Design a protein with these regions (language model features):
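Pre-Walker A adenine-sensing motif
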Residues: 1-14
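Conserved catalytic/switch belt of AAA+ P-loop NTPases
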Residues: 82-100, 104-106, 113-115
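Hydrophobic positions on the alpha1 helix immediately C-terminal to the Walker A/P-loop
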Residues: 33, 37
Length: 407
C-alpha cells in the first residue's frame, strides 16, 4: 500500500468538521484511504453496492438516521443523501460525523454547495504523486520556494527514468501492471468504466458514445489553449455540447483547465484557458505514447511532461496546507509561462517546463515578462528541465531539475 500524504489532512479535518468530503477520480485510492479511517470506530457503507444504493435512494432520511459516525463511499451515486446528512449534523454537530467519498466534484452542484455550506470540508485526492510512489516523504517544495530558497533534488530521475515515471502515471492499479501494453490496456478500460458509470451518475448525456472519442481528441490538445469549436468539429459536436461534455470530464477529475492569469495593469493578455490532463499515464495511453516512441521522437513528450508537472504541483499544493491558485500566462506577443502559482498574500511563482536536458536564457523570456508584470510580488521563476542540477539564471530565476518535485 502506498503512503497517502493527504491522509493527515483528512484526519485533521475530521477532528473539527462535521462532514468531510474526499473527492477525486475513480480508482485514485479514495476507498482504500476511507476504509483505513473506517476502522477508527466508523461504519463503512458503499453505494457501489446495488442493495445499499437502492435503500439510500428509497429513504434517505431513514438511511442516515441509522448511522452515527460513518464513511459513505461514492456519494455522487445518491446525492439525495446530502440533505439528510445536513439535517443529521444540524441536530448532532459533533465533528467527524461523516466522511464521504465521491468520484465527481459535487461542489460544482449548487444544491450541494448550498446545503452543506459551513458544515463540510472538501479534500481532493488525485492519483499517486512521485513522492508517494517512491515513499520519499512529502516534498517541501513550496516551503522552500516561498522562502526564496532555490529548489533542491535529493533523488535524481532523468532521461529514460523520467520518461518511464511520467508515462506510468499515478493510478495504483495501473502501476501493478508489468508491461507497457498491459498498463495502457488498463487505462483504456478505465475510460470505458468512467463513461459508463460516473458520467451517467452526474449528467444526462444524449451522445454518450461520443464521450470516449472526445476524450481522445482532448488528449491531443493537452497543454494547449482550449478551442471548443475546433475540438468539437473533429467528432461532429457543436461548440456548446463540446464545452458541456468537457466540463463533465473536469468534474470527474480527468482534466483540469488552467484559467489565464490576469492583471488590471496589463491589457495584452490572452483570455483563453489551457487544458491539462491530471494523470500523465492516462494521457500517454490515450495518445498511444510509450517510452520506445519517445526515444524515436522526443517531440511527442513535451506536452505530456507539461501536464505531468502541472498535476504534481497541484498534488504538492494539496499537502502544503496553503490555499494556492493556479493559472497560466500568455500575452499577445506569444510570451508565456506554463504555470503561475499565487498564494493568499499575492506572492507569485512562475514555472516553465522543458523536456530538454539543457536550458538557455531564451527559455526565461516569459518568466521575465511575468516578473516585470508582478514586481515585488514575484517570488521566483523556475524552468524545470530534464537534468539533475539547479542553475541560477539571474535574480530570482532558476533552472531546476524536474525531480525537485519528487523529494
Amino acid at each position: 500500500m502506498f503512503p497517502r500524504f493527504t491522509a493527515a489532512r483528512v484526519q485533521e479535518a475530521l477532528t473539527d468538521t462535521r462532514v468531510v468530503l474526499l473527492t477525486g477520480p475513480r480508482q485514485a485510492g479514495k476507498t482504500t484511504l476511507a476504509q483505513s479511517l473506517a476502522d477508527e470506530g466508523r461504519a463503512y457503507v458503499t453505494l457501489d453496492n446495488a442493495t445499499t444504493l437502492a435503500a439510500a435512494k428509497a429513504d434517505p432520511t431513514g438511511f442516515v438516521r441509522n448511522l452515527d459516525r460513518a464513511v459513505i463511499d461514492e456519494i455522487q451515486r445518491a446525492p439525495e443523501l446530502l440533505l439528510a446528512i445536513k439535517e443529521s449534523v444540524d441536530v448532532d454537530a459533533r465533528p467527524g460525523r461523516f466522511l464521504l467519498t465521491g468520484s465527481a466534484n459535487l461542489m460544482t452542484l449548487p444544491r450541494v454547495a448550498d446545503s452543506l455550506a459551513g458544515r463540510m470540508e472538501s479534500v481532493r485526492l488525485l492519483p499517486l504523486a512521485q513522492a508517494e510512489i517512491t515513499a520519499a516523504g512529502p516534498p517541501d517544495f513550496f516551503v522552500r520556494i516561498f522562502a526564496g530558497q532555490p529548489p533542491t533534488s535529493i533523488r535524481s530521475i532523468i532521461g529514460t527514468g523520467l520518461v518511464e515515471a511520467v508515462l506510468s502515471g499515478g493510478y495504483p492499479e495501473a502501476l501493478t501492471r508489468k508491461s507497457w501494453g498491459r498498463r495502457q490496456d488498463w487505462y483504456l478500460d478505465y475510460i470505458d468504466a468512467v463513461v459508463q458509470r460516473d458520467v451517467r451518475d452526474i449528467a444526462a448525456v444524449d451522445q454518450l458514445d461520443r464521450m470516449p472519442r472526445l476524450l481522445r481528441v482532448l488528449a491531443e490538445h493537452s497543454g494547449q489553449l482550449i478551442n471548443h469549436t475546433g475540438i468539437g468539429a473533429a467528432i461532429g459536436l457543436n461548440h456548446v455540447t463540446t464545452q458541456r461534455y468537457t466540463a463533465i470530464f473536469e468534474q470527474l477529475y480527468l482534466i483540469q483547465t488552467l484559467p489565464p492569469w490576469h492583471s488590471n495593469a496589463l491589457k495584452r493578455l490572452t483570455k483563453t484557458p489551457k487544458l491539462h490532463f491530471l494523470d500523465s499515464g492516462l494521457l500517454g495511453a490515450l495518445r498511444g505514447v510509450t517510452p520506445e516512441r519517445v526515444v524515436q521522437d522526443r517531440r511527442i513528450f513535451g506536452s505530456i511532461l507539461e501536464s505531468f508537472v502541472v498535476s504534481e504541483l497541484m498534488k504538492l499544493a494539496g499537502w502544503s496546507g496553503e490555499r494556492l491558485s493556479f493559472s497560466q500566462y500568455r500575452d499577445k506577443d506569444q510570451n508565456e509561462v506554463d504555470v503561475v502559482i499565487e498564494d493568499r498574500q499575492g506572492r507569485i511563482i512562475g514555472v516553465e517546463v522543458k523536456a530538454a536536458a539543457s536550458v538557455n536564457a531564451a527559455d526565461f523570456r516569459g518568466l521575465k515578462r511575468l516578473k516585470e508584470a508582478t514586481g515585488d510580488k514575484f517570488e521566483m521563476g523556475l524552468v524545470l528541465y530534464d537534468h539533475d542540477r539547479a542553475v541560477p539564471f539571474g535574480d530570482r530565476l532558476w533552472a531546476a531539475p524536474i525531480s525537485c518535485l519528487f523529494a
